Every structure is written in C-alpha cells, then in structure tokens.
Amino acid sequence: MIHYRTIDSPIGPLTLAGHGSVLTNLRMLEQTYEPSRTHWTPDPGAFSGAVDQLNAYFAGELTEFDVELDLRGTDFQQRVWKALLTIPYGETRSYGEIADQIGAPGAARAVGLANGHNPIAIIVPCHRVIGASGKLTGYGGGINRKRALLELEKSRAPADLTLFD
C-alpha cells in the first residue's frame, strides 16, 4: 500500500508518496512523468521528516536531504539518479557530464530521458542538470520551476571559503 500526501511549496503543490517512511515519489503538479496511482491512499500525516526537510530547503536552511528513498527504474536510470545525488547544492552539471560520470560517454540524450523519469524530484536533484551550453533544457516540472529551484540554490549557496583575502 502506497500512502501519499500533498503539501504546498513556493513552486506549487508537491505530492510525496511511499511506504512507511520510505519515499518512492515526489512530484510536482503538472509534472510530465505520472506514476500509477493504483492503490494509493491519502495520509495527511505521512512523511513528516521529508516535509520538514523540504520546508527547510525552501527556506534556504538545508542543502542536503537525509530521506530514505526507494528509487525504482532500469539499471541505466539507477546509475543516472545516483549520479544526480552527487551534484552539490548550488552547482549544475551538463547531461554529457553525467553521461561521462556514469561511464556512458555520448549518452547525454539518454541521461535526459532518465532525468525525465526521475520519480523523486528536488531530493534527487534532476533540476541541477542543464544543457552543455548552459541553457536550461527539459524539466518534468517545467522550465520555470527548474529556474526557480536553481535560483533558490544559487542565492543561498555557501560562499567559497578562503584563508587569505
């Protein structure tokens, strides 16, 4: 049985779903990837830890999530999603860089497709992947949401530390 809960956020409603405290989906309203909702049961108290972390993220107080995830997909998708988890807050990578990182040079388009099927948006930060030219391309939640998430992170990313001025 999958339990779900919808919360408000600065980028619109977010639906969290999973079993127990394990998150299997986090999606935005009108997101292109739509998981099957067969056997989903509403639970307004579910995923309170993840909700608290999302609220802290949007407030600029959290840069790394600590949520138990159940990511299901093909082997290639799994490799892409794990690579996304290594992109630091406030930084971006190109689709080609992710392809190279997972040992699949030339597979930038396939990385884009895997990004499009990321079941746990924001926490698995597919919004941090951009075109090789630096252009914002493709995002299941819409380019405006991608831009908003990147701007949030850029505005709150920790400054580089230096020992000497």
Curated annotation (Swiss-Prot):
One of its GO terms (biological process) is DNA alkylation repair. It is found in: Cytoplasm. It is an enzyme of class 2 (transferase). One of its GO terms (molecular function) is methylated-DNA-[protein]-cysteine S-methyltransferase activity. CDD domains: ATase. It catalyses: a 6-O-methyl-2'-deoxyguanosine in DNA + L-cysteinyl-[protein] = S-methyl-L-cysteinyl-[protein] + a 2'-deoxyguanosine in DNA; a 4-O-methyl-thymidine in DNA + L-cysteinyl-[protein] = a thymidine in DNA + S-methyl-L-cysteinyl-[protein]. The keyword rRNA processing does not apply. It comes from the Bacteria. PANTHER family: METHYLATED-DNA--PROTEIN-CYSTEINE METHYLTRANSFERASE. This enzyme catalyzes only one turnover and therefore is not strictly catalytic. According to one definition, an enzyme is a biocatalyst that acts repeatedly and over many reaction cycles. This is Methylated-DNA--protein-cysteine methyltransferase. It comes from Mycobacterium tuberculosis (strain ATCC 25618 / H37Rv). The gene is ogt.
